[in-house]
Amino acid sequence: MVEKIKVALVGRGNCFSGLIQGIEYYNQNPSQEVIGIIHAKLCDYTIHDIDFVAGFDVGENKIGKSLNEAIYEYPNMVDWIPKETMPKTDAKIYESPALDGVGIWVENRVKPIKSGKKIEELEKEIKDILKQTGVEIIVSYLPVGSEQATKFWAQVCLDTNIAFVNCMPAFIASNKEWAQKFTEKNIPVVGDDIKGQVGATIVHRTLARLCNDRGTKIEKTYQINVGGNTDFLNMKEQARLVSKRISKTESVQSQLDVPLDDDKIYVGPSDFIPFLANTKLMFMRIEGRQWANIPYNMEVRLEVDDKANSAGIVIDAVRLAKIALDRGLGGPIISASAYLMKHPIEQMSDPDAKTA
């Protein structure tokens, strides 16, 4: 048997709750393991070989609680596994510095703890916890727009020789300066900005690539996303969306031989609809021309559980980061980032990235 992969997560929201509850779902339903998992094994690591040993958050109602309790705390809304049947764990949730991680629309829901600790004090506490728990990989599920908070955690990884999986659109693995830092320290980093398993952007970029490869010319396209969880509420703050829009747009543009002009493509989150909860709706349109310059168009409506979409990809990102550690690889893990993330340092087609 392989040793457990020791993981800490930053941002104990719906995405993490979906990851934990999903693993427990497969524990309780082993016959379902063929459904929803890209790779049952990656170099002998299964989805059951991940041990979440610590978590970090800013919410006063989560800090100090055990992992199995915190994933059900407000404003989390994933409820695939009843709380009373979720196995207990000794792993705790510890305080993380808020920095820019709490937007104006969500601060009344998240209610950040006011401990009065200075960032230097928290940083020391965090590094001590990481050492005590033997963390090998940190996964960042910070909210969109958490630029300074993401950099804080990236630096913590560099200081403690811990691999970093960056699920959010704050550019670390795809930033040349940060990529060089991880390369120089020989620490793996997988990022940035997780693709959904069958999400809005992966569907959009796949169809864009199909149209491109079939010899048609795309003239304009849009993708509009709406949802009802804290992620979409946070994204009502337009100033937090700069990196997100870049990430999603470049993910689609990278699949075209000739990128579209900026005024011919729109890809981005659009609004918060409370009653949708964790359901995300995507509306996509492509307009183009084919043989004999004849016009065509297509429209797609996609309805998905936003957090199942994330967890099905992160489960591979963690295992691939561990394999990189086992093999002594450092810096951006190119193929893993290209296949699993929207904004890798090097874009590839999805089939090429999967086989790289």
What spans do the regions from the language model cover?
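Structural motif
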Residues: 10, 141, 167-168, 192
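Active-site-lining helix/loop region of Rossmann-like oxidoreductase modules
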Residues: 10, 48, 62, 73-77, ...
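Rossmann-fold NAD(P)-binding glycine/threonine-rich loop
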Residues: 144-159, 167-188
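Catalytic cores and adjacent flexible loops of soluble metabolic enzymes
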Residues: 9, 52, 137, 182, ...
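Hydrophobic beta-strand scaffold residues
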Residues: 164, 188-189, 218
